[in-house]
């Protein structure tokens, strides 16, 4: 799925000209969040998922995030890790790629700072800078992959923020979905995340 009219022509062609029997791309009248909501709903429907033999290669599938972890290990080693600490700055909308960096840190990689770079769709930057995760209208930009109102993978980090309490995480996310806003007291172990808004 892709948001109709909200990708570049090159991106649209990459998605819509694949000639494979097991690939079907559909343009959705909406934004990237609408596409993600539809995909999540399909994956939540277990009988449908099994009947259609669905798979996803975006960051909804944790395998994609796991596959990105070696990028950070490779980069850090080339910068002198483990003897030298490193910082990473990652343009992000859906929080998947930087979540891979965070996972690498949990495995022992000496990352001392994470800089979350965003465009005008800055829900992550606002949350990290001001503890303000409130949903706003998505504004189209020159970086459509970052034009996201709600970062799908943030729930995975929230699980860590909330002491790996699955019930509290589920309740917090349900409250967020109904109210459109969230504030969380992050533990000290998560304070090395920083926001940076791109120009």
Segments and roles (model prediction):
Residues 180-190:
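Aromatic-anchored, charged helix-turn/loop surface patch used as a conserved interaction hotspot
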Residues 192-195, 199:
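Single conserved hydrophobic/aromatic residue that forms the stacking wall/gate
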Residues 14-20, 43-49, 162, 189-190:
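Short, conserved catalytic or adaptor-binding loops enriched in Gly and charged residues
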Residues 1-36, 87-173:
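Glycine-rich phosphate/pyrophosphate-binding loop at beta-loop-alpha junctions
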Residues 36-41, 46-105, 109:
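Domain-scale recognition of functional cores that engage charged ligands
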Residues 59, 144, 192:
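Charge-dense, low-complexity intrinsically disordered segments
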Residues 174-180:
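Long, charge-rich alpha-helical interaction segments
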